Amino acid sequence: MKILAICNQKGGVGKTTTSINLAASLAYLKKKVLLIDTDPQANATSGVGIDKAAISQSIYNILVDEVNINDVIIKTAYENLDIVPSSIALAGAEVELVSAISREQRMKNAISEINENYDYVVIDCPPSLGLITLNSLTAANGVIIPAQTEYYALEGLSQLMNTFNIVRKHLNSKLDIFGVLLTMTDSRTNISNQVAEQVREHFKDKAFETVIARTVRLSEAPSFGEPIIEYAKNSNGAKQYLALAKEVIERG
């Protein structure tokens, strides 16, 4: 089971969009996928058509109350795709976990109890480097970093790499940079091309070949509670995320 944390402490880089659409594209390619939403905004939850208001238990109950993960998993309307939803209650979890025993291991322990045979677990991390993200990185065996092709992108990445190295040293020696994904690209602008070049130079073969362009369809899909592959199957966004999913499978 490959456990991939989609992580960047910088907001607005296409993290949740990538979590939803990578998970849905892997499921479309007949892989059994569990999406775990660990962002208190719960946008990955609503993005796959789950009503946030109708949820009785969420990732909050798993991390704070140590509820069994199998009791929280929900089947989505999409074949091969299940979700552990998030809720606004998670916003207070950081404080509640501070004094908890083995606080960084809660997610890892929960995932080890999963009954289903998932091929992939995709974790949507919150846009911060707090305890929830640490839990995700401790549980994962790979990190996918979405990086927006804009001026400050590399600055944010160096901060994230710092955290990655700390987690690797103290909490999870098996953690690996699975890939860096260029998002919201616009090949018509110099800055987009320059940043893409810098990221590829720095991360070499860790940078995915696939890039995700800025498109209207991709930004519309979440408000309809659908992954792009359902909302606009023939759009560029759908094709790009499908290509990314194939690259992820190829990388093992």
List each language-model region with its residue ranges.
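P-loop NTP-binding core
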Residues: 1-252
